[in-house]
């Protein structure tokens, strides 16, 4: 809640009737840069002076209210001014000058008995800011009376400061964009369009945004045989034998690189992200050595933890993983990172800036140089040295010298890696490269005024603050627009220790963002965030806020970040404090749930989807046994236990769906979204009933309209926790028995099932107790199927329908998951998936022009066909018919797609053309024909059989 001066509180508590004045500062179109000019207006009955500025009265006709809620939205406001054609603003508008995108600031002043402005804001000793934003639209209406005097009314539509969030502000891996190139006197020159002056001479993306093909060569020894003869019997005869030998053969392979420009993401915490290739070339004298430069993230990052070569990381997951492939160290429990390759010993430290790492995955030598995106980093010396000697293939092809990659290629603020591949018989193409990145260093502010900026943070508020204040990729808001102590207070709530699990339960601690496996790392909200900078600032801010249940508002002119939280000292409001306009709304029947199914990307599963599923038996009993499932997806949470706690809170919140609306006087000014309220209303039997503020609407006359959301005390981040840390530690190893007898049954012919149904997967349940659901991964699909285990009959098959899938090879991987999140080993099934069979056979398929008494002969030059439409056309859109025509040798003459009609004429001209096509252009016709037809749908639906003639 925005604080106001104690003297203002006393005045407002002792004065029921208030005189308010809105003070408007409207930027004029003549403003430019720092030389902004304004016109100052007020809706008060007389002129008002504030801070030495005169606000003129008599022009402002009306001002609307300003509303904000817990959902990030662009708030709006409108106001009208009126006057004669001689007025300054009216003259400008009537002369065609636009006020669009000009700034506007409105203060709401309280005028005391002495006619002075009451000091309210402790930061300025003046009035509170009512609105700040921009003009986004408007209109003018003229009125000329009988005496010829004309007046005009202008209505301005304004949007608050969140209007500026509706833009994309990311860096593009393109040289022209990076350096701000523009044409000057016919040549490209860097300009102030670069996000930093230093970027103007940074050539790091010079080779990007191009397609490159490289001819790589490598040598292999191939087995050969030669015939060897030997004389026998004094030269009268010979014997022959084959002798094996090896010959060195040079082979060539074309390597295609698409260096298309992309937006550089922002990473906080630890995440796996794909590399963006920005340079590729081979060594001139060693054409099997390929260098590729990949951009990964905005810097400066803490470092790289591991690289994935294709689908395989350099660091082993566990003992089993190390037994099946070439890898090093252990991610599980030990927390090894790629720096082990350079250090030679076990370490959980991230990579070192500029360090070379050597690795061999069994398919050939790989070398990686890591660069963390420092603001002053220098060019990679390994590439500079090669280019200096003209040692690159494309460099020589294009006639370039050392400038091909010299000291100007710094890639400032860009976390990137150089990867050197050796092409050989085991590696004939460049694999996809992705990396586990420990993200951007952020500033963390402390109550004592100190600032730490030496590492990344899992705290969503510090991530949000970094993004909001960045001019390079974020909202570009200056720090002085945030109440810093308020931000610090809210951030501490996210750092409360989660006591629902023990540290040892998180074996992949290093890859969920922890630096060490200590209990103080169990913060209740931990975000590992990727921000797609090709999306708008608005969408990215919204995504972070949703990840920690936060809100941001600027009702008082500051950007105030708040968290949903419980308070033992909420603002207390009695019904008698309101204007009596109370409205209670209850939507509990629609929005309450008794079970939850949530998904997250889990580093313990090689960054594949994991699921959290549980239900509340008490809630289900209240819902009379009906299953009501809440679906959640966590984009920025990768810690299973953080996601589990969040899902539990959201399930509890869903049981509270009552909202309370009413209006209060100006003495409650400063209320903002997410403020805790204790409301008392004797008629309802409420005594300090707990609510959170969901929406605030400040009106011009000082009345404040509120919408409150009911909650219990146990649904918040800072609510009293249930300590599960003393429970048995979940076994890290897989001790959940797998499902049994996994098989696929296609939809039988002639059976009409669900629309587009291919068939059914079925299995017998796991024999492990406490299995709550089954996860089925489907090749080519991101999200798995989730099937709840509601019954415990071990001999009753469980079923998952497969609907609307195209025909072809499909691989299904089935696992059982118990109540603690433990997963069984997978049961895999490869299926040559049939098409979705669910449509009826076409009926009454016939030849219309048959010979009398002989349905096998047609009369006339053409064959006229007809059929009846299938009944499914009434329920399935976009049904069409496929008609195929064959000759006497069963060769297809043509296949025709037919829509919205149920007849087809196979004309004589068609017949002649089809005959000529299959008979080397000879003249003639097909006299014996076979026709067949079936119905099909856009989602893979097909008739279960063909109708034939």
Curated annotation (Swiss-Prot):
Where is it localised?
A: Virion
The stated induction of this gene product is:
Expressed in the late phase of the viral replicative cycle.
Keyword annotations from UniProtKB, A to Z:
Late protein, Ubl conjugation, Viral baseplate protein, Viral tail protein, Virion
Q: Which GO terms describe its cellular component?
A: virus tail; virus tail, baseplate
What's noted about post-translational modification? Answer: Ubiquitinated by the Bil antiviral defense system when this protein is expressed in E.coli MG1655 strain expressing the Bil system.
Q: What is its main location?
A: virion
Function recorded in the entry: Forms the simplified baseplate, together with the p132 collar protein, the baseplate tube protein p140 and distal tail protein pb9. Closes the tail tube and, upon infection, opens to form a channel thereby anchoring the tube to the outer membrane. These changes allow the tape measure protein pb2 to be expelled and phage DNA to be transferred to the host. Also forms the start of the central straight fiber, which is continued with the straight fiber protein pb4.
**Subunit architecture:** Homotrimer. Forms a pseudo-hexameric ring. Interacts with distal tail protein pb9 and straight fiber protein pb4.
This one is known as Baseplate hub protein pb3
| Source species of the chain | Escherichia phage T5
């Amino acid at each position: 809640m925005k604080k106001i001066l104690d003297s203002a509180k006393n005045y407002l508590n002792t004065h029921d009737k208030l005189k308010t004045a809105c003070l408007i500062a409207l930027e004029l179109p003549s403003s430019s840069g720092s030389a902004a000019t304004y016109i100052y207006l007020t809706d008060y009955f007389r002129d008002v002076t504030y801070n030495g500025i005169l606000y003129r009265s008599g022009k402002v006709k009306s001002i609307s209210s300003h509303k904000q809620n817990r959902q990030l939205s662009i708030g709006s406001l409108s106001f009208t001014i009126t006057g004669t054609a001689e007025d300054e603003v009216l003259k400008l508008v009537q002369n065609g000058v636009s006020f669009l995108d000009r700034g506007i600031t409105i203060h709401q002043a309280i005028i005391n008995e002495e006619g002075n402005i009451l000091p309210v804001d402790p930061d300025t000793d003046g009035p509170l800011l009512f609105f700040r934003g921009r003009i986004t639209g408007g209109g003018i209406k003229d009125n000329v009376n009988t005496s010829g005097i004309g007046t005009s009314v202008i209505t301005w539509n304004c949007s608050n400061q969140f209007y500026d969030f509706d833009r994309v502000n990311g860096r593009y891996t393109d040289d022209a964009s990076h350096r701000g190139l523009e044409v000057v006197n016919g040549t490209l020159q860097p300009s102030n369009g670069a996000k930093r002056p230093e970027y103007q001479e940074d050539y790091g993306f010079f080779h990007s945004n191009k397609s490159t093909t490289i001819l790589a060569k490598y040598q292999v020894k191939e087995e050969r045989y030669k015939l060897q003869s030997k004389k026998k019997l004094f030269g009268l005869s010979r014997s022959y034998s084959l002798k094996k030998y090896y010959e060195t053969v040079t082979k060539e392979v074309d390597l295609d690189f698409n260096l298309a420009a992309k937006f550089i993401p922002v990473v906080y915490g630890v995440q796996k992200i794909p590399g963006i290739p920005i340079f590729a070339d081979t060594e001139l004298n060693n054409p099997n050595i390929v260098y590729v430069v990949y951009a990964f993230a905005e810097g400066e990052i803490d470092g790289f933890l591991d690289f994935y070569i294709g689908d395989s990381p350099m660091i082993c997951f566990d003992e089993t993983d190390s037994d099946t492939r070439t890898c090093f160290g252990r991610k599980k429990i030990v927390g090894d990172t790629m720096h082990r390759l350079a250090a030679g010993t076990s370490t959980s430290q991230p990579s070192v800036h500029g360090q070379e790492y050597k690795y061999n995955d069994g398919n050939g030598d790989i070398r990686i140089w890591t660069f963390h995106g420092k603001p002053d980093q220098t060019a990679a010396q390994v590439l500079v040295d090669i280019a200096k000697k003209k040692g690159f293939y494309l460099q020589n092809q294009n006639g370039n010298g050392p400038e091909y990659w010299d000291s100007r290629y710094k890639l400032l603020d860009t976390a990137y890696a150089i990867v050197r591949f050796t092409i050989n018989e085991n590696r004939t193409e460049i694999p996809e490269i992705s990396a586990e990145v420990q993200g951007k260093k952020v500033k963390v502010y402390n109550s004592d005024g100190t600032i730490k900026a030496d590492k990344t943070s899992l705290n969503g508020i510090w991530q949000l603050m970094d993004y909001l204040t960045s001019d390079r990729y974020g909202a570009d808001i200056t720090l002085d627009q945030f109440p810093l102590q308020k931000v610090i207070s809210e951030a501490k709530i996210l750092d409360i220790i989660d006591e629902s699990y023990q540290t040892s339960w998180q074996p992949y601690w290093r890859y969920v963002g922890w630096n060490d496996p200590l209990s103080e790392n169990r913060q209740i909200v931990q975000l590992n965030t990727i921000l797609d900078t090709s999306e708008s600032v608005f969408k990215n801010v919204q995504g972070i806020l949703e990840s920690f249940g936060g809100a941001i508002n600027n009702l008082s002119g500051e950007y105030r970040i708040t968290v949903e939280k419980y308070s033992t000292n909420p603002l207390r409001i009695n019904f008698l404090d309101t204007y009596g306009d109370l409205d209670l709304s209850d939507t509990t029947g629609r929005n309450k749930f008794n079970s939850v199914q949530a998904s997250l990307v889990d580093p313990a599963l090689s960054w594949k989807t994991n699921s959290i599923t549980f239900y509340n038996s008490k809630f289900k009993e209240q819902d009379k046994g009906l299953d009501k499932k809440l679906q959640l997806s966590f984009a920025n949470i990768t810690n299973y236990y953080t996601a589990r706690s969040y899902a539990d809170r959201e399930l509890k919140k869903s049981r509270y769906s009552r909202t309370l609306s009413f209006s209060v006087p100006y003495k409650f000014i400063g209320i903002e979204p997410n403020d805790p309220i204790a409301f008392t209303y004797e008629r309802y039997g409420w005594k300090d009933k707990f609510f959170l503020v969901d929406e605030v609407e400040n009106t011009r006359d000082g009345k404040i309209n509120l919408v409150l959301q009911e909650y219990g005390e146990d649904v918040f981040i800072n609510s009293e926790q249930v300590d599960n840390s003393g429970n048995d530690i979940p076994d890290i190893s897989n001790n959940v028995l797998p499902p049994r007898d996994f098989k696929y049954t296609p939809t039988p012919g002639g059976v009409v099932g669900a629309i587009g149904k291919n068939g059914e997967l079925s299995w017998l349940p796991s024999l492990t107790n406490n299995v709550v659901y089954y996860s089925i991964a489907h090749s080519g699909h991101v999200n798995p199927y989730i099937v709840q285990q509601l019954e415990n009959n071990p001999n009753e098959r469980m079923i998952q329908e497969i609907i609307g899938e195209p025909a072809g090879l499909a691989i299904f991987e089935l696992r059982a998951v118990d109540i603690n999140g433990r997963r069984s080993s997978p049961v895999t099934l490869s299926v040559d998936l049939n098409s979705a069979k669910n449509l009826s056979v076409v009926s009454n398929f016939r030849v219309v022009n048959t010979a009398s008494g002989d349905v096998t002969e047609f009369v006339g030059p053409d064959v006229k066909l007809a059929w009846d439409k299938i009944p499914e056309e009434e329920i399935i859109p976009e049904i069409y018919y496929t008609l195929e025509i064959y000759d006497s040798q069963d060769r297809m003459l043509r296949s025709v797609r037919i829509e919205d009609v149920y007849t087809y004429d196979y004309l004589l001209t068609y017949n002649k053309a089809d005959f000529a096509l299959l008979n080397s252009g000879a003249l003639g016709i097909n006299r014996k024909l076979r026709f067949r037809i079936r119905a099909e749908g856009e989602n893979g639906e097909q008739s279960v059989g063909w109708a034939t003639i």
